[in-house]
Every structure is written in structure tokens, then in C-alpha cells.
């Protein structure tokens, strides 16, 4: 089984320069690939795949335009992966899975430096450092987090990323299967919401962390820092004395706050999933939420985005697979909140403001807990 381990690293100044150059080259190549295919389409020519583009780039374009030979200075596997990402983006567009690919803007896009194990000396890992192709040995902040080479583990591939002035490495490692599910245990249903983050059919409720005092304080601070950054840009447009270095410092402050808030939410999701999986249910049933549709509601979009429902589903799927637990996804149109768990009657006139489910049979329960109970016993589902 392949598992990804992500942790912060402490590269030297020389290594930071290489990371910046490689990530910048990957961003340039990705945008170049999109622009070239867009030009081919406008000229009525055939779409160019990633492999054909690399051949054309190395044998036709670069010899003709030697001023772009700096592209070859970057780690070749990272550049190749950037082109592959561009091809994947086009395939998703052609299959009507996403919108037309957008260009990646400097400083605003999540571009990563990909690496892969090519020879035995590459991608070695020790307790306090990891060997990355084109960078060499890099210090790890959390010592012992990534399984080491001495323990018999091998890094297959990975990537280096930057966020808010910090550097991270994500390593893909093959580990033995560790299935802990007990078939004798009962399955559970999980209802996700905005009032509370997750309501489990076993009676456990996980609160909405965005309502905590800590996050509210950070969000207020973020608003102040964003307002300060906006004023600096306004002063620059008016021609007043505002140095660009101060703008960059303020941008970094805003990025760090965004990163801190995001880390708190992600950490809460990880701990919630770990606690759910520790109960060792035979299966877990969740609902197929239409998150993109929910985001179209201007009154709820911010609250929906801050809950990170999609990330919860992806991580729950990975954790369930790791522990041998079957993850079931109920049909998108299954009315889990409107069905009486006691008699099965569908209450069609149930409003979003009705927080308590009351049925004519006398059954009274919290609507979210009632939905979790219904999800636990749903018969129509698909395996995630």
C-alpha cells in the first residue's frame, strides 16, 4: 500500500534558490503548454500531447530560441511532470469534468517541485534528513516522522512545495497493509453540516471549529491585515510613498494567517477522522454532498468553504482503505434528513430552519442525528 507523508523541511539558502528556480520553471512550462495548445486550436491544428510537446520543445523550439535554454537547468523530472499536469487539466476539460485550464500566476498558484527515485542513491531518508534529487540532503523539522531507509522503506516519488514562506516535502512510500476493521462491529452513518461539523450515528457529535473563539480571533486579525494590504496598494496607485518591499512584507503576513487558519481546520479534520476510525466500524456511510451547488448560495458559500467537506471525504476514504473499512456513499438525492428513522415516513415539508424532526408516529429527534441514523441503514449506495 502506498502512503504519503508530508512534513516541513529546513533547506539552506542555496537549496531555497534551487527550489524557487525549479518551481518557477515548472510554472512557466505549464503555462507555455496551455498557451501552445490554445494557439494550435485557434489555427485548426490537432491537440498536442505531453510527450509530443516535450519532443517539440527540445528538438525544435529551444534550438530556434536559445534564450530559453535556462529551462534545461531545472530538474528534468519536475519539468516533465508540469507538462503532464497540463495534459491532465485538458483531459478533464474534454471529459466535461472541469472548466478550461487556467494559467498559473506567480505567487498565487500551488506549483510544486516533483521528484522521483531514479537510482538507489536518490530519495534516501534518515531520521533527521531526506535526500532529494537536485537538492541533496535537506533537514526535516519533525524528526522521525517519515519512515527511514534503514527500516526498509523506500520513497517512490514526492514533491517539494512552498506556502507562506515555509517549505514542505511530501514523500510517497510503500508500507505494509494494516487492516484493523472488525466485521462484528456495527457500521456507522455520518451526517455533515454547518451547525455542527459531523454527527455520527453512534451518538458522537463533532462541533464546528469555525465557531471557536480561537478561529474567530484569527479571522478578525486576518481582516485587519487584508485591509492594511489593500490600503498600501491604493497608496501605490495614487503615487504616494509606499515601498514595494513593505507590500511584500504585508502580503507575507496575510499568507501566514491564511496558512495558520487552514492548518487548524485541517488538523481538526485529521483528528476527527482518526477518532472515527478508532471505533473500528464494519462500514462508514456518508452522503454525496453537492458542494459546488452549495457554494452558489451567496449566504452559505463562505461557511461551506470553511468546513472543507471535500477534504474530509478524501481523507476519510484514504484512512478507511488503510484500515480495511468499507466507505459507502449514499445517493445524492437520498432524503436522509426527511425520513423518519422510526416508521420510514418521508416528511416533505421539512424546512432547513426545523432543527428538530417530529413525526406523526411520535418520534422526536435532532434532525442531523436522525439523518445519521438513516445513512447508517441506507440500502442504495456506492463504494467510494
Each predicted region: which residue ranges?
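Gly/serine-rich nucleotide phosphate-binding loop at the start of the catalytic core
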Residues: 1-79
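Positively charged, helix-rich recognition surfaces that bind polyanionic ligands
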Residues: 3, 148-151, 163-384
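Beta-strand secondary-structure signal
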Residues: 6-8, 85, 129, 168-170, ...
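Ordered, soluble secondary-structure elements with a strong preference for glycine-centered loop motifs
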Residues: 13, 17-20, 77-80, 200, ...
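Stable alpha-helical structural segments in soluble proteins, enriched in small hydrophobic residues
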Residues: 33, 78, 82-93, 367-379, ...
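Long, hydrophobic, amphipathic alpha-helical segments used as structural scaffolds
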Residues: 34-41, 90, 94-101, 175
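Acidic carboxylate diad motif detector
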Residues: 52-166
